[in-house]
Amino acid sequence: QANQDFMRF
């Protein structure tokens, strides 16, 4: 679930 990691911005 890298989506959440990308939304950390």
Curated annotation (Swiss-Prot):
Keywords: Amidation, Neuropeptide, Pyrrolidone carboxylic acid, Secreted
GO biological process: neuropeptide signaling pathway
Main location: secreted
Protein localization: Secreted
GO cellular component terms, A-Z: extracellular region
Keyword Secreted: yes
Tissue specificity: Detected in the thoracic perisympathetic organs in larvae, and the dorsal ganglionic sheath in adults (at protein level).
Positions of post-translational Pyrrolidone carboxylic acid modification: Q1
Keyword Secreted attributed: yes
Modified residue annotations for Phenylalanine amide: F9
Transmembrane segments: none
Similarity-based family: Belongs to the FARP (FMRFamide related peptide) family.
This protein's name: FMRFamide-7
Organism name: Lucilia cuprina (Green bottle fly)
Species classification: Eukaryota, Metazoa, Ecdysozoa, Arthropoda, Hexapoda
